[in-house]
Regions:
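Short, low-complexity N-terminal intrinsically disordered segments enriched in polar/charged residues
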Residues: 17-43
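Short solvent-exposed beta->alpha transition segments
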Residues: 31-32, 47-100
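Generic anion/oxyanion-binding catalytic loop in active/binding sites
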Residues: 8, 38, 55
């Protein structure tokens, strides 16, 4: 019995390790892509940021509207002071999108006009195995609302 258990472990352990190594590789690649994408956004390279969108996102948004939205958002945020990577994880399936390679990334960012901002990104690989933005979201506490709450 011990020999059978040992044999099973020897057969499946390399596969599990191999799988974990690839997940970490995907997370590293996706994080590098997101860092560059956010840099384009923060440096007003909005066309490059739009090109980082996945084709599925581009179906529902044109470049002019997206670039205008980027400009408005960065005007609201101000200059980036710092950004810290908080969370990353890999997922092989997303409801409505199906099977694929997806990485979820969360950052804590500090902008000139926004003291504390959480930025959330979902990236997926396209048909050419390139990472592309599927979703970008953010949240922050509005200082004006905070002042009203304290009254």
């Amino acid at each position: 019995m011990i020999n059978k258990t040992s044999l099973l472990l020897l057969l499946f352990l390399p596969q599990l390790l191999f799988s974990q190594i690839f997940k970490e590789k995907y997370i590293t690649e996706a994080n590098e892509f997101c860092t560059n994408w956010l840099s384009n956004l923060n440096n007003k390279s909005y066309g490059k940021a739009y090109n980082g969108f996945h084709e599925k996102v581009k179906l529902n948004s044109d470049s002019l509207s997206s670039c205008n939205a980027f400009s408005q958002l960065m005007g609201e945020f101000g200059t980036l002071n710092s950004r810290k990577l908080d969370t990353t994880f890999f997922q092989s399936n997303i409801e409505e999108l199906g099977d694929g390679f997806y990485v979820f990334i969360e950052y804590t960012s500090f902008y000139k006009k926004i003291d504390l901002c959480q930025e959330y990104i979902i990236v997926g690989q396209n048909d050419n195995l390139k990472w592309k933005i599927l979703r970008y979201d953010f949240s922050y506490a509005n200082e004006e609302l905070n002042k009203e709450d304290k009254k």
